[in-house]
Amino acid sequence: MDEFHRCGKEDSFWQQCFLYPLFFQEDLYAISHDHYLDVSSSSRPMEHLSSNDQLSFLTVKRLIGQIRQQNHSIVLFVNCDPNPLADRKKSFYSESVLEALTLVLEVPFSIWSKSSVEGMNECKSFRSIHSIFPFLEDKFPHSNSILDARIPYSIHPEILVRTFRRWIRDAPSLHPLRSVLYDYRNSPENLQRSIIVVPRVNTRFFLFLLNYYVCECESILFSRLKRSSHSRSLDHGSFPQRTHFHRKIKHIIIFSRRNSLKSIWSLKDPKIHYVRYGERPIIAIKGADLLVKKCRYYLLIFRQFYFHLWSEPYRVCSHQLSKNCSSSPGYFLRVRMNPLLVRTKTLDELFIPVLITNEMDPIVPIVPIIGLLATEKFCDISGRPISKLSWTSLTDDDILDRFDQIWRNLFHYYSGSFDRDGLYRIKYILLLSCAKTLACKHKSTIRVVRKELGPELFKKSFSKEREFDSLPFSSKAAARSQRERIWHSDIPQINPLANSWQKIQDLKIENLFDQ
């Protein structure tokens, strides 16, 4: 693949016009075959990995020929696998061809995405999820409204293929992609749907589709805004495989589809900040309510016009930061006023003015987290700790390590909040749940378990926050860190509990719109 990338940099035209011959490279299928076996070995028993899982390149070439000639309304790869796996919906050869298809399409996509990123000026991107919070602290207090928009992940297969045609000139190379997409659409669980829904599974192909779709949406959006506003200060671009990124847009022009894009609404010097984590963009706006309504209307019309899909109104919600709390990745966000006393002493008299500054105040959602812990059987619905019965078959060290990992993730993620009383309540629940689990395993009580294991029981677990607070700073910085928030930036993804809580919030918003 590195050789393909080097060739693409030297001659990108060759990459776009002659992708189809890559499907007949045996090295490509050897790579996809090994990758498929590595992934499937972790989810299948060893008895399923027999010698019949050897790849036949002749069979692969026959399948590619059938892809080009078959009717797209027929499910792909029917009766093609001589030894289908009972626990897999896709056949062995279809997965191998799917891996090879992803490898081929990643070549021009990576070159195009890198060139778009390198061509931007004064743009910043961050991979860590926690770099979003310093940005919110810096930008959100200067805004009065936010738009919480969710990127639609439902799109018709043919529209997705046509978007690929914008930057891939080799039309035959898109036939396998079209067949795979229609194959997924014709699956039993999607027969009643008119559009394809990209599933949230950890496969390379669907991860590539999601990255491409998000990159395409954002690149078209920002390029359209830059072309419309005629402003050189408006940067645009896309960041695939990033957790989020942010933009500051100084000028924006909104087009109305009702008048066939003839009427132009000019928004003079609005302050708009854009940040995205996962598939949830947040747009902070400082302006009147009319500006917020125009931006919300523009996002809905943009998705309809370019991707021919109807986006439900609840997918773009507006909130007033000065009045209501907004839900960001696992937090309640609000802007609170912080009064400061400034003493100015002159020769005649003393002035004591009061300065009021705005700052972001993230609140830990304790009640939803307790509800999620109750779902995972760490406590009941009222927050009373219970034993984790499914872990009683593990060793004591494994039980302690698992509880320690849960608390470490929670403390790491929510350590930026001013009020940590809720965090210590979560710590208490996990601590007693750990002790009750060990007591249930040894058929004793918490007092007996603590007496047998001694004080090392709670020193080994739930002690990581001491390491986080005692950072290698100076004494003054260490004292200041006890009063200020510390955003830990070594978490690669959103906490699963925070992600689940965000889904619950989305369901509540949908129910409000349904009513």
Swiss-Prot record:
Q: Does the keyword DNA damage apply?
A: no
Gene Ontology MF, one: RNA binding
Under InterPro entries, the record lists:
Domain_X, Maturase_MatK, Maturase_MatK_N
The Gene Ontology biological process terms listed for this entry are: mRNA processing; RNA splicing; tRNA processing
Q: Where in the cell is it found?
A: Plastid, Chloroplast
Q: Which domain of life is it from?
A: Eukaryota
Which GO CC annotations does the UniProt entry carry?
chloroplast
Keywords of this protein's UniProt record, alphabetized? Answer: Chloroplast, mRNA processing, Plastid, RNA-binding, tRNA processing
* Family to which this protein belongs: Belongs to the intron maturase 2 family. MatK subfamily.
**Entry's HAMAP family?**
MatK
Protein role:
Usually encoded in the trnK tRNA gene intron. Probably assists in splicing its own and other chloroplast group II introns.
Annotated PANTHER family: MATURASE K
UniProt-recorded name of the protein: Maturase K
Source organism of this protein record: Pinus densiflora
Its taxonomic path starts at:
Eukaryota, Viridiplantae, Streptophyta, Embryophyta, Tracheophyta
State the gene name recorded for this protein: matK
